[in-house]
Amino acid sequence: MTQEEISGISQDENNLIAERRSKLTALRQTGNAFPNDYRRDNLARILHEKYDSCSREELESSQVTVKVAGRMLFKRVMGKASFATIQDMSGRIQLYISNDHTGETAHEAFRHYDLGDILGAEGVLFKTRTDELSLRVTQLHLLTKSLRPLPEKFHGLADQEQKYRRRYLDLITNEDTRRVFAIRSKIIQAIREFLVDRDYLEVETPMMHSIPGGATARPFVTHHNALDMSLYLRIAPELYLKRLVVGGMEKVFEINRNFRNEGISTRHNPEFTMLEFYEAYQDHNYLMDLTESMLREVALKVSGTTRIVYQQREMDLAQPFARLTIAQAILKYHPEYSDAQLNDRDFLTKALQAKGVTVNPDSGIGGLQLALFDETTEHLLFEPVFIVDYPAEVSPLARCNDANPEITDRFELYIAGREIANGFSELNDPEDQANRFLEQARAKEAGDLEAMHYDADYIQALEYGLPPTAGEGIGIDRLVMLLTDSPSIRDVILFPQLRKED
């Protein structure tokens, strides 16, 4: 008995590719090398669910005939009979190919098939002596000839970067990767259902903006040839969604891509997926409650539990999320600071400079506190916590607090040491918004590349009247990281941005 595992051990890969191309040439000479007339009627997972519990005798008596298709991952040739395992979108199933049932000609052809080839198989279900559900093949079809050998031993790609560059190979060989992206799809579907059930309307807004807005970030710039004008890939859909609220669409949401021309890290990808949703006649406190409910419901639908293990630490989303100001969070995790120090501009400036942080001379106390929070505390926030009362100077689109105009009715949600969501009561005073845009424009002129542009059309929309509104953005990729226990954002984006290969 001989056993073929993965090619590429004893021969150079180029020789293997040449050998497979030779087989493809022979196939072309005999007819259609890439047929498209085979139709399966079952998936591996469904067959296992239906028939794994059946005995050998039950299967033999019922003579269940099925048609399956998938990529061949294992192949074992033994004289007058052979075994193979194929993988489809749902799982794997074993094939039994023999002279008696499949025919000598088809069995002989199978001997020359390679791992990675895509097969269609028709036959009768049975169980082997080891009780493995298998298909006794009566007809075998080579649907696609694979010209390149798969990674050795199907242990997946050893090089992490190659997993990202050649995600198709990672998906073929790594069940965990397939699981992550199946969960991602379920998360997005669960979010949609949560919002639609509450009468939110899903909308689509432009991906190319004449003026970048809705966030403080550097945009990607492109050019429209026919209009001879610069356009920006959107950094956020916020200003368009609020235009819709002005127009009477009082509960809207969008799940789509944002683009920011900034750094790449385990938490950042230049192209990422964001949920943004807006509701008229509500405020930021309502949004915090709604967000807690949303995350619990999504976790239950996706995982069946609100208990999450992330990087070997456990949390329970069923517990109430804490709410802390920026200063309270710093003091909780850094008792070496005092409240007086956190309200001392000179102290904050020196503390930040000591940590190598460049201090903006125009920053107020709130901005300096936030910089210290980002540097010292953000990464320590494992349990879900809403950080509230963001300073007005860093919140150009948020409504100022009625009792203290130095802060805004804004929050950010942190889980597992990273920001998951950002929301606030929306600024709907057009004159206040215009003044804040002017401040941002001055900052941009002074060299702040992330400052916002002045958007006159948005101001005009506000002048028609934006009702009291609350809005929020949730980073889908980071939420998927949390619910799949993935350490890097690249693990949850099918094709993350990477440097160009040499």
UniProtKB/Swiss-Prot annotation:
Keywords, ordered alphabetically: Aminoacyl-tRNA synthetase, ATP-binding, Cytoplasm, Ligase, Magnesium, Metal-binding, Nucleotide-binding, Protein biosynthesis
Needed co-factor(s): Mg(2+)
InterPro entries: Aa-tRNA-synt_II (IPR004364), aa-tRNA-synth_II (IPR006195), aa-tRNA-synth_II/BPL/LPL (IPR045864), Lys-tRNA-ligase_II (IPR002313), Lys-tRNA-ligase_II_N (IPR044136), Lys-tRNA-synth_II_C (IPR018149), NA-bd_OB-fold (IPR012340), NA-bd_OB_tRNA (IPR004365)
GO molecular function, one term: magnesium ion binding
Reactions catalysed: tRNA(Lys) + L-lysine + ATP = L-lysyl-tRNA(Lys) + AMP + diphosphate
Subunit structure: Homodimer.
Official protein name in the record: Lysine--tRNA ligase
